């Protein structure tokens, strides 16, 4: 038996007291009030209620080392990204690698692979496959149902997946940005219980009043905490905290769920409500085998120096100390590489786009649809603009910050799709990535055609990863596992990734996380205008549109 003394934070009964907990065989066997001089705080370990581990660009066992250092003892994870590339084989890869580390990872079954029928993916998880996966005990819920039009319009394939989850008694996660009114009522009525895509306070309140749980997301790109934080005190039983997509530099230097407890207190939120959102609500909602600092619970807890500073000193999982005083106390063997990548290099001719003959004379020139990126958001706007034309071809216009963007399939040598985007900010060079939600094709944006092609071809040579630079001066981060994750240690990935971000900033971008923002510009389920490997897509209309706008 081992004992630990400190100021015990009981979020269930909303009290703090000096005491001692006793741990034996991985369980808390007693919690007693006891006088002592120790000023450190003991509280339940933190839970990320929705995360795609792949977005850390590290495999689960390496992600675990970063997470426990921030007081996280469990995550609810959707292996959606790797499933889009490798299907069930990718899900099994994540499960197997996660078992190498003590972090409690509760994987779900991806519900939308591919996310839409309007893009090329490496796999399809149809209703039959989803039913088979939901029957497994090592997969715990149906992951975010992004196809909200399919739910509302009762597409048979979509409804079959929802019914499978109900049959096995497993929760259904939602994904419904901007959905409201009768459509939202129908979506919730289909059995969907959570949403992490609320961008407005009023939107989140409407969902809560219909019975949904709102997951407040604060990742590397999508950051909704400042908009939604008041919900934690106003609806304490209906809110959880999550990161969704967090890059390694964010995890190591900013923090994980711990940073939201610090920021929440700075905003005047009740500490017990914050702990409820960070631990109790996800454990109870998903039925996780994670301790809540009660007698008989698994001994999953953390020790921090001070509640407001919230510096994690120790992390315990099942009674074992996995992090102590700046050191992670478990190591993992390097994961094997695994990938699907069938693309060959491209040429400058592949990214050329000729101006239609009817639009070559002055004011009669047709305007093009331009994607308008928004820093820190997954949603985009759209606007019409006159293109810059040189030698009869449409080119990037860095002076107006209207840049050419391309998306091309990683699974076959299909034609390159071309669009234009605003607010990336590059004055020269290009950035490219094989992380391109959700099918993870190749996406690139740049100041010249030559720079775009150079970045894409370096990425093809590496069979996935991220690239930045000019055509004759490129730096990269290869991602050997499905073009999404590195097999390196988290710190190594974070350092290299920050080098790439810094290089992108030198080339002109002011985006907080340029690669993360770029990776969502082909996500055809989040409004308003996106570019996929089959063309320009209006998410609001849920249909392809021409680059050149009609009169």
From Swiss-Prot:
Manganese is among the record's keywords: yes
Top-level enzyme category: hydrolase
Superkingdom of this protein's organism: Archaea
Signal recorded as keyword: no
Pfam families to which the protein is assigned, alphabetical: Adenine_deam_C (PF13382), Amidohydro_1 (PF01979)
UniProt EC number: 3.5.4.2
Cofactor: Mn(2+)
InterPro entries: Adenine_deam, Adenine_deam_C, Amidohydro-rel, Metal-dep_hydrolase_composite, Metal_Hydrolase
GO molecular function terms attached to this record: adenine deaminase activity
Catalytic activity: adenine + H2O + H(+) = hypoxanthine + NH4(+)
One biological process term in Gene Ontology: adenine catabolic process
Keywords, in A-Z order: Hydrolase, Manganese
Family statement: Belongs to the metallo-dependent hydrolases superfamily. Adenine deaminase family.
HAMAP family xrefs: Adenine_deamin
NCBIfam families from the UniProt entry: ade (TIGR01178)
Name of this protein: Adenine deaminase
Annotated source species: Methanosarcina barkeri (strain Fusaro / DSM 804)
Gene label: ade
């Amino acid at each position: 038996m081992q004992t630990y003394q400190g100021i015990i934070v009981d979020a269930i009964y909303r009290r703090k007291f000096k005491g001692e907990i006793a741990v034996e065989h991985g369980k808390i066997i007693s919690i007693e009030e006891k006088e002592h001089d120790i000023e450190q705080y003991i509280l339940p370990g933190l839970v990320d209620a929705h995360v795609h581990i792949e977005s850390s660009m590290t495999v689960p066992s390496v992600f675990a080392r970063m997470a426990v250092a921030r007081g996280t003892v469990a995550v609810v994870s959707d292996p959606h990204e790797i499933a889009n590339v490798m299907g069930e084989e990718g899900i099994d890869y994540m499960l197997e690698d996660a078992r190498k580390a003590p972090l409690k990872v509760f994987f779900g079954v991806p519900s939308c692979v591919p996310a839409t029928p309007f893009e090329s993916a490496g796999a399809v998880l149809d209703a039959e496959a989803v039913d088979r996966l939901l029957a497994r005990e090592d997969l715990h819920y149906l992951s975010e149902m992004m196809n909200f039009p399919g739910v509302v319009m009762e597409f048979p394939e979509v409804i079959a997946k929802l019914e499978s989850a109900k049959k096995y008694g497993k929760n259904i996660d939602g994904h419904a940005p901007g959905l409201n009114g009768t459509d939202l009522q129908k979506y919730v009525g289909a059995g969907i219980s959570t949403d992490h895509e609320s961008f407005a306070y009023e939107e989140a309140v409407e969902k809560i009043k219909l019975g949904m749980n709102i997951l407040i997301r604060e990742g590397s790109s999508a950051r909704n905490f400042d908009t939604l934080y008041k919900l934690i005190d106003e609806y304490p039983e209906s809110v959880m905290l999550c990161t969704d997509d967090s890059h390694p530099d964010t995890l190591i230097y900013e923090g994980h769920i711990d940073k939201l407890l610090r920021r929440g207190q700075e905003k005047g939120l009740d500490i017990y409500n914050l702990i409820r959102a960070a631990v109790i609500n996800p454990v109870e909602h998903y039925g996780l085998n994670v301790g809540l600092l009660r007698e008989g619970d698994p001994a999953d807890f953390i020790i921090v120096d001070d509640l407001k500073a919230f510096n994690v000193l120790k992390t315990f999982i099942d009674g074992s100390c996995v992090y102590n005083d700046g050191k992670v106390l478990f190591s993992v063997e390097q994961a094997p590489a695994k990938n699907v990548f069938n693309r060959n290099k491209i040429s400058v001719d592949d990214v050329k786009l000729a101006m239609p003959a009817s639009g070559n004379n002055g004011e009669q020139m047709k305007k093009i649809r331009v994607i308008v990126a928004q820093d820190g958001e997954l949603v985009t706007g759209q606007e019409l603009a006159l293109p810059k034309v040189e030698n009869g071809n449409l080119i990037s216009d860095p002076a107006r910050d209207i840049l050419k963007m391309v998306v091309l399939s990683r699974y076959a040598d299909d034609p390159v799709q071309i669009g234009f985007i605003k607010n990336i900010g590059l004055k020269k060079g290009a950035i490219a990535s094989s992380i391109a939600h959700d099918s993870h094709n190749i996406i690139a944006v740049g100041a010249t055609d030559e720079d775009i092609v150079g970045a894409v071809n370096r990425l093809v040579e590496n069979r996935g990863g991220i690239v930045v630079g000019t055509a004759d001066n490129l730096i990269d981060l290869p991602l050997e596992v499905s073009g999404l994750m590195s097999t390196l240690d988290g710190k190594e990935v974070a350092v290299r990734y920050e080098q790439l971000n810094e290089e992108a900033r030198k080339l002109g971008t002011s985006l907080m996380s340029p690669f993360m923002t770029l990776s969502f510009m082909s996500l055809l389920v989040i409004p308003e205008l996106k570019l996929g490997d089959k063309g320009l897509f209006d998410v609001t209309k849920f249909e392809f549109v021409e680059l050149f706008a009609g009169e």
